[in-house]
């Protein structure tokens, strides 16, 4: 039984899909006016992992993640660069895929662009106007929050508190300060589409409501995104969607917490961000994913070079274990398991059971990773050169099986690792010739930390794993 923390009801609940064995999941994707930063990357990695885990547990997942490709920020960027908004969108969607692929984020079932759904959005807006939930003023169309009885139920605030606490730009044309635009009249220099209210473009909130409804249906299983989207974006999505259809919009709402730098939320507006591409130039995708999944997705995560280095060391420990097993598979002579080994292999299932228990409990990736470490500690101790090839192979398959939903630990250590070690040994040999013994010792210690021991023999330097 999988339990998820439902932001809507402020508690963990058993996940029961609308259709048995299927999950309809919508995740708010990027506004494509720049490279995405590692804070955005955490959101994408978290929900990629959750999607993978549902699939691991046997569900068929329809996973929709949108691109916001018409937006104030995009218009500003296009005007600054003297190109069209479409060109900005095309460019940064391509860049998104490059970085997401590099982070081993699986492609969505569908990645809709808002501009592909303008006709559907206009129908959606017209439906809200016809039902009395929205009104037009000078070509703008606003959603009337007071008309929707449940407004504020996701963020847990009542509308009076929201009015008094929110910093709202004064617009005398609105019936209420909390009303928000679902269609915006064209301004000079902006792209626009013809509508019953004149030339204009959709508001941000209406885009996701419309695409989710069109691609997944009036009620979906899971709507997810970063916790900064809870209000107003997701609150407004609920209001629009449920006002139009009269049905619950999403049964479960999942929100991932911020990534912080110096105890402040990482964001483009604060200019304290690192793009995913910058980090990928220096660290492997497994390292970045490990760091992003090392805390529960609802816990804020601090980001620093030290934590990246710690994640790198942890990932290397697991790949050392994988490398040991790969070497044993090549080196051991006995093919099949004996009865004692079969019993030992069966005992390893306790780590899989612990892993599933933790992931079933609101996707606790931090504790699931601990279960993998416990597994490799066991295999490092008990699977040796005297073991069978079959046992080493089965243990390796189990490590990879548990790593797959996390998007990690799938690479082979053969070739690349050996080349890297040989290069370090050559560097150490040169340091010794140059009588730079401090560097030679540093390289030896670095290799030892990675589970590699050097032996100086008359035939030259040999290395082995420990």
Curated annotation (Swiss-Prot):
HAMAP family: Cys_tRNA_synth (MF_00041). This is Cysteine--tRNA ligase. Gene3D superfamilies: Cysteine-tRNA ligase, C-terminal anti-codon recognition domain (1.20.120.1910), HUPs (3.40.50.620). Keywords: Aminoacyl-tRNA synthetase, ATP-binding, Cytoplasm, Ligase, Metal-binding, Nucleotide-binding, Protein biosynthesis, Zinc. It is an enzyme of class 6 (ligase). A motif ('HIGH' region) lies at residues 30-40. Its main location: cytoplasm. PANTHER family: CYSTEINE--TRNA LIGASE, CYTOPLASMIC, CYSTEINYL-TRNA SYNTHETASE.
């Amino acid at each position: 039984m999988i339990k998820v923390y439902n932001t809507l009801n402020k508690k963990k609940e058993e996940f029961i899909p609308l259709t048995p064995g299927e999950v309809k999941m919508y995740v708010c994707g990027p506004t494509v006016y720049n490279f995405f930063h590692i804070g955005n990357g955490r959101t994408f990695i978290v929900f990629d992992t959750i999607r993978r885990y549902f699939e691991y547990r046997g569900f068929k997942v329809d996973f929709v993640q949108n691109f916001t490709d018409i937006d104030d920020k995009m218009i500003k960027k296009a005007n600054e660069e003297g190109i069209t908004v479409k060109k900005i969108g095309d460019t940064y969607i391509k860049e998104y895929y490059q970085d997401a692929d590099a982070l081993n984020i699986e492609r969505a079932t569908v990645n809709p662009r808002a501009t592909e759904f303008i006709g559907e959005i206009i129908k959606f807006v017209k439906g809200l106007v016809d039902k009395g939930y929205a009104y037009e003023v000078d070509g703008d169309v606003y959603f009337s929050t007071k008309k929707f009885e449940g407004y504020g139920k996701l963020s847990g605030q009542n509308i009076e508190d929201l009015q008094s606490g929110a910093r709202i730009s004064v617009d005398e044309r609105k019936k209420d300060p909390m009303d928000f635009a679902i269609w915006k009249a064209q301004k000079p220099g902006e792209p626009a589409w013809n509508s019953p209210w004149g030339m204009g473009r959709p508001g941000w909130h209406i885009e996701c409501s419309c695409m989710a409804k069109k691609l997944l249906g009036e009620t979906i299983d899971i709507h997810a995104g970063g916790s900064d989207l809870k209000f107003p974006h997701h609150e407004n999505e609920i209001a629009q969607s449920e006002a139009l259809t009269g049905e619950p919009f999403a049964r479960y709402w999942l929100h991932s917490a911020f990534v912080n730098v110096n105890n402040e939320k990482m964001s483009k507006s604060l200019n304290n961000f690192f793009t995913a591409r910058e980090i990928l130039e220096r660290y492997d995708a497994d390292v970045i994913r490990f760091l992003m999944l090392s805390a529960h997705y609802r816990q804020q995560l601090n980001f620093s070079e030290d934590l990246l280095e710690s994640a790198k060391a942890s990932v290397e420990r697991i790949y050392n274990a994988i490398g040991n097993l790969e070497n044993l598979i090549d080196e051991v002579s006995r093919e099949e398991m004996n009865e004692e080994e079969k019993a030992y292999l069966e005992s390893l299932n306790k780590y899989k059971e612990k892993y599933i228990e933790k992931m079933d409990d609101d996707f606790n990736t931090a504790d699931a990773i601990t279960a993998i470490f416990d597994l490799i500690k066991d295999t490092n101790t008990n699977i040796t050169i005297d073991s069978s090839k079959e046992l080493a192979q089965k243990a390796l398959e189990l490590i990879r099986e548990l790593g797959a939903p996390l998007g990690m630990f799938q690479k082979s250590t053969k070739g690349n690792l050996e080349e890297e070690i040989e290069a370090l040994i050559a560097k150490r040999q040169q340091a010794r010739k140059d009588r730079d013994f401090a560097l030679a010792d540093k390289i030896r210690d670095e290799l030892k930390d990675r589970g590699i021991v050097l032996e100086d023999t008359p035939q030259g330097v040999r290395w082995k794993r420990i």
